[in-house]
């Protein structure tokens, strides 16, 4: 997959 920005935890 392409890199996706994860939501800040």
From Swiss-Prot:
Cofactor annotation comment: Binds at least 14 chlorophylls (8 Chl-a and 6 Chl-b) and carotenoids such as lutein and neoxanthin.
The entry's keywords: Acetylation, Chlorophyll, Chloroplast, Chromophore, Magnesium, Membrane, Metal-binding, Phosphoprotein, Photosynthesis, Photosystem I, Photosystem II, Plastid, Thylakoid
GO-annotated biological processes: photosynthesis
Source superkingdom: Eukaryota
Record bears the keyword Acetylation: yes
Subcellular location(s) of the protein: Plastid, Chloroplast thylakoid membrane
Function: The light-harvesting complex (LHC) functions as a light receptor, it captures and delivers excitation energy to photosystems with which it is closely associated.
Comment field on protein domains: The N-terminus of the protein extends into the stroma where it is involved with adhesion of granal membranes and post-translational modifications; both are believed to mediate the distribution of excitation energy between photosystems I and II.
Quaternary structure and interacting proteins, as annotated: The LHC complex consists of chlorophyll a-b binding proteins.
Protein name per Swiss-Prot or TrEMBL: Chlorophyll a-b binding protein
Organism: Spinacia oleracea (Spinach)
């Amino acid at each position: 997959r392409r890199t996706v920005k994860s939501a800040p935890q």
